């Protein structure tokens, strides 16, 4: 077989190609560096070009110094894709906006506009006219009191609008009718007391609506007729006492519902019957006293349920029936003191995290539940007044990854307990009464990724904290221990471990001091014995004094009445002589 001959000059062609690739690589690197270089822009701002994987090259202008009274748009590059105007909380801006981004030359490439903490009183009618590529507007932390449809004219491609943390009180019908592409609307933390009918007309694509922290008190079903494809609804802290269930019929695709921290006292058994696609439900922070049987019977796709911080004393035996997809359950900070085991039967195979914190539960009630939940990954047991946890408490939960035992009364680190949880990666043992950690405790902690040991009563003497200081400087526990603060002795209270060294620690009590303590104890014992002896002698003397006093009285009486004494003596003699005969039995 003949070998193919390489054509003349082919090696040179390959070498030239390699050189070209090298030159091309250098060119690309230089181009990237040039893209990230600073661009001429106003002194109070920074302008930089970045590269986004999906969007490509993006020119970002950011002004965050604060105390701005005008936006220097005349000095902005008109090709900017992102403009961000913000200010520190202590040094806010005082701005007004109008058609500054549209005239005389519009920012036609602008995709995101953030104007935050700038005391903007109003938006204006044509502030965004012609900005057809604008996708996100963020006007949070301003002083907006009202909005209307003309404020958003021309924003046909806007998908996100953030108006939270303002002072908006009212919005007319069809306020957002020009925002036909809008998917996310955040109106939380305003002063909205009423939602007028057809407020959300033309928002057929809206999937995320946040109305939290507004004094709504009630929700009108007519408001939700135009947003039937809503996926997330948040009405947290809205003073709601109930929700008209007709609303749930109008938003059947809802996947997340947050009604936390309202004023609900009860829920009807068919409350959420229409929300068959619901995956996350928050009812925490209300006034619910009971969860009745089959409350969530139609919510088979529910994965997360929060019932924390209510007034629940009991979960009905069938309260969780049909929740065969439930992964996260929070029943913390209620008044529960016992469980029905059948309550947890429907979720045995799926539940991964459960929070028992802040209830009146004894450990044995929790232990029984954990025995039937072998695949549990996260457990909350905070604020249960625990002084100790048995070493075999998590014997059936070998897959435990996260454990919260904060806000208890633990005085010793639960080393033996944690040796049973080999996969533990997150541990919160803060706000207890731990004073020290031994070397074996620290070795166990080295294997845990996230640890919170703060707010314990750490003793900063060489015996208690010496080993901890050594571990702070030589192991991965550096950051964890550095953040701790001394509780005792008083002269070191509040001092950070980061500022401590072994030499600064209080000296351990010496052997001589220990001996002196023993001697002092013996001396106190001797004093107590002497006091007892002295008391006994005092009592004896008092008795003797009484005896001699009585004898003297008898003698004085005999001296004054000799005849009586003589008669007693004769009577005694007669009794002595005749007594044997008197005691003799009959017939003797």
Predicted regions and their residues:
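Extracellular leucine-rich repeat
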Residues: 2-7, 11-588
């Amino acid at each position: 077989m003949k070998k193919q001959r390489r054509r003349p000059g082919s090696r040179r062609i390959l070498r030239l190609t390699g050189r070209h690739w090298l030159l091309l690589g250098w060119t690309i690197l230089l181009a990237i560096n040039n893209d990230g270089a600073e661009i001429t822009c106003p002194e109070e701002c920074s302008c930089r070009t970045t590269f986004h994987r999906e969007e490509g090259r993006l020119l970002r202008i950011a002004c965050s110094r604060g105390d701005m009274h005008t936006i220097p748009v005349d000095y902005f590059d008109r090709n900017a894709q992102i403009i961000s105007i913000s200010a520190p909380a202590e040094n806010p801006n005082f701005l007004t906006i109008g058609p500054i981004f549209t005239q005389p030359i519009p920012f036609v490439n602008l995709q995101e506009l953030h104007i935050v903490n700038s005391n903007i009183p109003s938006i204006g009618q044509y502030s965004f006219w012609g900005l057809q590529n604008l996708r996100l507007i963020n006007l949070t932390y301003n002083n907006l009191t009202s909005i209307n449809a003309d404020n958003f004219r021309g924003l046909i491609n806007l998908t996100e609008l953030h108006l939270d943390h303002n002072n908006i009180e009212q919005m007319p019908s069809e306020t957002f009718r020009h925002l036909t592409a809008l998917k996310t609307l955040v109106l939380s933390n305003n002063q909205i007391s009423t939602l007028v009918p057809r407020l959300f007309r033309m928002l057929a694509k809206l999937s995320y609506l946040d109305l939290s922290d507004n004094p709504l008190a009630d929700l009108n079903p007519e408001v939700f007729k135009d947003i039937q494809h809503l996926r997330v609804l948040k009405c947290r802290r809205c003073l709601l006492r109930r929700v008209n269930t007709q609303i749930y019929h109008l938003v059947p695709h809802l996947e997340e519902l947050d009604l936390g921290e309202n004023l609900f006292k009860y829920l009807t058994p068919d409350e959420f019957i229409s929300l068959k696609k619901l995956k996350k439900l928050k009812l925490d922070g209300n006034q619910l006293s009971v969860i009745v049987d089959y409350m969530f019977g139609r919510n088979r796709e529910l994965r997360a349920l929060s019932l924390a911080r209510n007034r629940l004393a009991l979960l009905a035996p069938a309260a969780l029936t049909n929740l065969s997809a439930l992964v996260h359950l929070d029943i913390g900070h209620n008044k529960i003191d016992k469980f029905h085991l059948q309550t947890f039967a429907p979720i045995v195979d799926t539940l991964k995290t459960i929070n028992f914190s802040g209830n009146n539960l004894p450990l044995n009630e929790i232990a029984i539940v954990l025995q039937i939940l072998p695949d549990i990954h996260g457990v909350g047991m905070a604020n249960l007044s625990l002084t100790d946890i048995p070493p075999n408490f998590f014997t059936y939960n070998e897959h435990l990854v996260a454990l919260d035992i904060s806000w208890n009364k633990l005085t010793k680190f639960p080393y033996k307990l944690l040796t049973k949880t080999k996969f533990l990666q997150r541990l919160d043992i803060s706000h207890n009464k731990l004073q020290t950690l031994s070397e074996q405790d620290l070795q166990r902690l080295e294997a845990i990724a996230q640890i919170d040991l703060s707010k314990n009563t750490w003793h900063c003497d060489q015996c208690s904290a010496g080993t901890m200081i050594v571990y702070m400087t030589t192991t991965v526990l550096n950051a964890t221990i550095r953040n701790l603060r001394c509780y005792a002795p008083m002269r070191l209270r509040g001092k950070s471990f980061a500022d401590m060294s072994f030499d600064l620690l209080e000296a351990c009590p010496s052997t001589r001091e220990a001996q002196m303590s023993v001697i002092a104890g013996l001396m106190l014992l001797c004093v107590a014995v002497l006091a007892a002896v002295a008391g006994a002698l005092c009592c004896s003397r008092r008795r003797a004094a009484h005896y001699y006093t009585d004898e003297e009285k008898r003698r004085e009486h005999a001296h004054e009445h000799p005849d009586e004494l003589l008669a007693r003596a004769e009577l005694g003699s007669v009794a002595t002589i005749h007594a044997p005969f008197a005691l003799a039995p009959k017939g003797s």
